[in-house]
């Protein structure tokens, strides 16, 4: 029985068998948790779906882990900044409404 996608095809997409297993497992868990698929699948199982995505090149190992960490950190900082800005706007609106209420 021939497995599809073939291991040879998949190993062209990742540096090693070990990387392939880790990437497949992580993507399969993401799919099980409800992550949006990147394509239509022929397989039913999440592990085989993950392999199909890897074969098509839609799922890859991030080439620079440090750059990925930096991008995640920047996104977190931006989200925090936006939340603080929103909180300041709400406090200013509350103060304005309170001030207008005292004038009446």
UniProtKB/Swiss-Prot annotation:
Classification via InterPro entries: DNA-dir_RNA_pol_omega, Pol_omega/Rpo6/RPB6, RPB6/omega-like_sf
Protein name stated in the entry: DNA-directed RNA polymerase subunit omega
Protein EC: 2.7.7.6
Q: Which GO terms describe its cellular component?
A: DNA-directed RNA polymerase complex
**Molecular function as annotated in GO:** DNA binding; DNA-directed RNA polymerase activity
Alphabetically sorted, this entry's keywords are: DNA-directed RNA polymerase, Nucleotidyltransferase, Transcription, Transferase
Q: Which HAMAP family match?
A: RNApol_bact_RpoZ
Protein role: Promotes RNA polymerase assembly. Latches the N- and C-terminal regions of the beta' subunit thereby facilitating its interaction with the beta and alpha subunits.
Principal EC category: transferase
Membership in a protein family? Belongs to the RNA polymerase subunit omega family.
* Source superkingdom: Bacteria
Q: Name one Pfam family in it.
A: RNA_pol_Rpb6
A GO BP term here is:
DNA-templated transcription
Q: Does the keyword Ribosomal protein apply?
A: no
Its quaternary organisation is: The RNAP catalytic core consists of 2 alpha, 1 beta, 1 beta' and 1 omega subunit. When a sigma factor is associated with the core the holoenzyme is formed, which can initiate transcription.
Enumerate the SUPFAM superfamilies for this protein. RPB6/omega subunit-like
């Amino acid at each position: 029985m021939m497995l599809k996608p073939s291991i040879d095809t998949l190993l062209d997409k990742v540096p090693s068998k070990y990387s392939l297993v880790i990437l497949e497992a992580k993507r399969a868990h993401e799919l099980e948790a409800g992550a949006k698929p990147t394509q239509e699948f022929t397989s039913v199982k999440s592990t085989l779906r993950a392999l199909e995505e890897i074969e098509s090149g839609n799922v890859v190992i991030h080439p620079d882990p440090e750059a990925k960490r930096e991008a995640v950190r920047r996104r977190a900082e931006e989200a925090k900044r936006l939340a603080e800005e929103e909180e300041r706007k709400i406090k200013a609106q509350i103060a304005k409404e309170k001030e207008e209420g005292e004038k009446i």
